[in-house]
Protein backbone atom coordinates (compact mmCIF):
# COMPACT_ATOMS: atom_id res chain seq x y z
CA UNK A 1 0.00 0.00 0.00
CA UNK A 2 1.39 3.45 -0.98
CA UNK A 3 1.81 6.15 1.62
CA UNK A 4 -0.05 9.43 1.16
CA UNK A 5 1.64 12.82 1.46
CA UNK A 6 -0.07 13.33 4.81
CA UNK A 7 1.32 10.03 6.10
CA UNK A 8 4.84 11.06 5.06
CA UNK A 9 4.50 14.53 6.60
CA UNK A 10 3.21 13.09 9.86
CA UNK A 11 6.10 10.62 9.97
CA UNK A 12 8.62 13.44 9.38
CA UNK A 13 6.94 15.60 12.04
CA UNK A 14 7.53 12.87 14.61
CA UNK A 15 11.25 12.54 13.72
CA UNK A 16 14.06 14.21 15.65
CA UNK A 17 16.06 16.98 13.98
CA UNK A 18 19.04 14.67 13.51
CA UNK A 19 16.83 12.08 11.80
CA UNK A 20 15.39 14.74 9.47
CA UNK A 21 18.90 15.93 8.55
CA UNK A 22 19.89 12.34 7.77
CA UNK A 23 16.72 11.92 5.69
CA UNK A 24 17.47 15.07 3.69
CA UNK A 25 21.03 13.90 3.02
CA UNK A 26 19.77 10.48 1.90
CA UNK A 27 17.25 12.14 -0.45
CA UNK A 28 19.97 14.39 -1.89
CA UNK A 29 22.13 11.34 -2.65
CA UNK A 30 19.29 9.18 -3.99
CA UNK A 31 17.82 11.81 -6.32
CA UNK A 32 20.96 13.84 -7.09
CA UNK A 33 19.51 17.14 -5.87
CA UNK A 34 20.55 19.76 -3.35
CA UNK A 35 18.21 21.15 -0.71
CA UNK A 36 20.41 24.25 -0.32
CA UNK A 37 19.24 25.76 -3.63
CA UNK A 38 15.61 25.62 -2.55
CA UNK A 39 16.45 27.36 0.72
CA UNK A 40 18.31 30.18 -1.07
CA UNK A 41 15.40 30.78 -3.44
CA UNK A 42 12.92 30.83 -0.58
CA UNK A 43 15.05 33.31 1.38
CA UNK A 44 15.32 35.85 -1.45
CA UNK A 45 11.81 37.38 -1.10
CA UNK A 46 12.37 37.90 2.62
CA UNK A 47 15.49 39.91 1.84
CA UNK A 48 13.53 42.09 -0.60
CA UNK A 49 10.87 42.71 2.04
CA UNK A 50 13.52 43.77 4.54
CA UNK A 51 15.01 46.17 2.00
CA UNK A 52 11.63 47.78 1.48
CA UNK A 53 11.12 48.22 5.22
CA UNK A 54 14.55 49.74 5.86
CA UNK A 55 15.08 52.39 3.23
CA UNK A 56 18.64 53.68 3.28
CA UNK A 57 18.65 56.34 0.56
CA UNK A 58 16.36 59.34 0.48
CA UNK A 59 15.63 62.12 -2.01
CA UNK A 60 14.98 65.62 -0.69
CA UNK A 61 12.10 67.10 -2.70
CA UNK A 62 11.24 70.79 -2.47
CA UNK A 63 7.44 71.10 -2.67
CA UNK A 64 7.29 74.90 -2.44
CA UNK A 65 9.57 77.77 -1.49
CA UNK A 66 7.01 79.50 0.71
CA UNK A 67 7.15 83.19 1.63
CA UNK A 68 10.94 83.44 2.09
CA UNK A 69 12.11 82.41 -1.37
CA UNK A 70 15.49 84.19 -1.10
CA UNK A 71 16.35 82.31 2.11
CA UNK A 72 15.35 79.02 0.49
CA UNK A 73 17.57 79.75 -2.51
CA UNK A 74 20.51 80.39 -0.15
CA UNK A 75 19.94 77.08 1.64
CA UNK A 76 19.57 75.21 -1.67
CA UNK A 77 22.90 76.68 -2.80
CA UNK A 78 24.52 75.55 0.44
CA UNK A 79 23.14 72.02 0.20
CA UNK A 80 23.76 71.44 -3.50
CA UNK A 81 26.73 73.66 -4.31
CA UNK A 82 24.81 75.12 -7.27
CA UNK A 83 25.30 78.63 -8.54
CA UNK A 84 22.77 81.38 -7.86
CA UNK A 85 20.92 81.01 -11.19
CA UNK A 86 20.76 77.20 -10.98
CA UNK A 87 19.52 77.30 -7.37
CA UNK A 88 16.89 79.94 -8.28
CA UNK A 89 15.71 77.83 -11.24
CA UNK A 90 15.47 74.77 -8.98
CA UNK A 91 13.41 76.68 -6.39
CA UNK A 92 11.20 78.27 -9.08
CA UNK A 93 10.57 74.84 -10.60
CA UNK A 94 9.14 73.37 -7.38
CA UNK A 95 8.21 70.64 -6.85
CA UNK A 96 11.75 69.55 -7.66
CA UNK A 97 14.39 67.22 -6.26
CA UNK A 98 17.06 69.15 -4.38
CA UNK A 99 19.38 66.24 -3.59
CA UNK A 100 19.20 62.50 -4.34
CA UNK A 101 20.41 59.31 -2.63
CA UNK A 102 21.21 60.84 0.77
CA UNK A 103 21.53 58.90 3.99
CA UNK A 104 18.63 59.28 6.41
CA UNK A 105 20.61 61.63 8.68
CA UNK A 106 21.79 63.86 5.81
CA UNK A 107 18.29 63.95 4.30
CA UNK A 108 16.73 64.90 7.65
CA UNK A 109 19.37 67.62 8.11
CA UNK A 110 18.71 69.08 4.64
CA UNK A 111 14.95 68.94 5.23
CA UNK A 112 15.33 70.74 8.55
CA UNK A 113 17.49 73.49 7.00
CA UNK A 114 15.03 74.04 4.16
CA UNK A 115 12.03 74.09 6.49
CA UNK A 116 13.76 76.61 8.76
CA UNK A 117 14.24 78.80 5.67
CA UNK A 118 10.47 78.62 5.03
CA UNK A 119 10.21 75.84 2.43
CA UNK A 120 7.85 72.89 2.31
CA UNK A 121 9.94 69.71 1.90
CA UNK A 122 9.25 66.00 1.48
CA UNK A 123 11.60 63.02 1.78
CA UNK A 124 11.09 60.22 -0.72
From Swiss-Prot:
Keywords: Ribonucleoprotein, Ribosomal protein
Region (Disordered): 101-124
GO cellular component: cytosolic large ribosomal subunit
A Pfam entry, by short name: Ribosomal_L12_N
Source taxon at top rank: Bacteria
Keyword GTP-binding: no
GO BP, one annotated term: translation
Keyword Glycoprotein: no
InterPro entries the record matches: Ribosomal_bL12 (IPR000206), Ribosomal_bL12_C (IPR013823), Ribosomal_bL12_C/ClpS-like (IPR014719), Ribosomal_bL12_oligo (IPR008932), Ribosomal_bL12_oligo_N_sf (IPR036235)
Composition bias type Basic and acidic residues, residue spans: 101-115
GO molecular function: mRNA binding; structural constituent of ribosome
Protein role: Forms part of the ribosomal stalk which helps the ribosome interact with GTP-bound translation factors. Is thus essential for accurate translation.
PANTHER family per the UniProt record, alphabetical: 39S RIBOSOMAL PROTEIN L12 (PTHR45987), LARGE RIBOSOMAL SUBUNIT PROTEIN BL12M (PTHR45987:SF4)
Record's subunit section: Homodimer. Part of the ribosomal stalk of the 50S ribosomal subunit. Forms a multimeric L10(L12)X complex, where L10 forms an elongated spine to which 2 to 4 L12 dimers bind in a sequential fashion. Binds GTP-bound translation factors.
Family statement: Belongs to the bacterial ribosomal protein bL12 family.
NCBIfam families: L12
Protein name: Large ribosomal subunit protein bL12
Taxonomic source organism: Hahella chejuensis (strain KCTC 2396)
